[in-house]
Amino acid sequence: MGRTLKIFAVLAAILAVLLGASVVFGTGIFARNSPSASARACPPSSPVTVGRIVVPAGPIAGYCQDRLINAAHVMMAARSLGIGPHTQAIGVMTALGESGLRVLDHGDAAGADSRGLFQQRDNGAWGTYADRMDPYISSLNFFTKLVSIPGWKNLSPGEAAHAVQVNEDPNHYDPYLPRAEAIVTALGS
């Protein structure tokens, strides 16, 4: 009994140290698609223009310019289809939930062939590899699919994202909406 308690105490101490480091450094267990630790102090950079959107160094909603540029591509793709800020936020929310606004060149649990901002699969529905890796084209493909869904305007943002992405968890995208709205508002003004 005494030995079991010692082992339990050692394991609990190790877990506490790991969780503490995760909280202090903003990495690890709880940071899969959260803003990077470096986003709290973005590197100085000149504004970049994506279409008509001027992207500052950041941070906006905890994200720096490298990821905000991708959000601007999502917004520009939506605008090219006549889609307003509310639905632009759905696209940004989805990209946050899928990749943390990064163009990922590797798969995820849903599929080893998933790529890009939206982790789109190589099943022919999302275009070529190059299309899936291009923030603007992959965003166009996302919004084209969204507007083809009957009644999409009546769906909540999370339901709309889920209808396109068919994530295992239909509520997966909901926590990303406030940051997406903040990004769209800041970049849209």
Predicted features, each with a name:
Residues 91-93, 117-121, 163-165:
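Soluble periplasmic/extracytoplasmic beta-strand elements of cell-envelope proteins
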Residues 30, 84, 100-101, 152, ...:
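A general structural signal for well-ordered secondary-structure junctions
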Residues 41-96, 100, 187:
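Export/targeting segments at the very N-terminus of extracytoplasmic proteins
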Residues 1-16:
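N-terminal export and membrane-targeting signals
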Residues 20-43:
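C-terminal region of N-terminal signal peptides and the immediate post-cleavage residues
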Residues 132-133, 137-189:
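Catalytic and binding regions of secreted/periplasmic enzymes and modules that target cell-wall glycans
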